[in-house]
């Protein structure tokens, strides 16, 4: 019998490796302004226009230390694969759009 946890771990590890490759690619430059546009269309309905989350939905506050202390690879993996109630965006967003989104989330810490 196959071990489902082993498969899940392999999938997570693979996603993190892919995210790391994307983040450290020399050709890729994250653009927070482009990420803001993606956030507005894909994320704001749940996380709020200001990124501070919506209490009724119990969504993450993107400005919080808990989110800001996550690595770029973690944020990329969560955006790509989803987590909990958050859907996966790996099939609907391109890797550079996800990078831009992470850059925008980082900019929210300064607001």
Predicted regions span which residues?
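N-terminal export/targeting leaders of redox proteins
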Residues: 1-33, 111
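Periplasmic c-type cytochrome electron-transfer domains
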Residues: 2-14, 47-50, 69-74, 89-107
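Generic alpha-helical propensity signal that fires on short helical segments
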Residues: 19, 23, 80, 85, ...
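Ubiquitous "structural anchor" signal
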Residues: 19-23, 28, 43, 59-61, ...
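Periplasmic/extracellular electron-transfer cofactor-ligation site
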Residues: 32-60, 77, 81-87, 107-111
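Conserved protein-kinase N-lobe ATP-binding Lys motif
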Residues: 65
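Transmembrane alpha-helical core positions of polytopic small-molecule transporters
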Residues: 68-69, 82
């Amino acid at each position: 019998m196959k071990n489902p946890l082993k498969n899940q771990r392999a999938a997570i590890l693979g996603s993190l490796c892919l995210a790391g490759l994307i983040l450290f690619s020399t050709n890729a430059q994250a653009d927070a302004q482009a990420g803001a546009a993606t956030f507005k269309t894909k994320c704001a309905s749940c996380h709020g226009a200001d990124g501070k989350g919506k209490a009724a939905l119990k969504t993450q506050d993107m400005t919080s230390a808990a989110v800001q202390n996550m690595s770029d690879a973690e944020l990329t993996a969560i955006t790509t694969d989803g987590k909990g109630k958050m859907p996966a965006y790996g099939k609907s967003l391109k890797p550079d759009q996800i990078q831009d989104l992470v850059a925008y989330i980082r900019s929210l810490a300064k607001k």
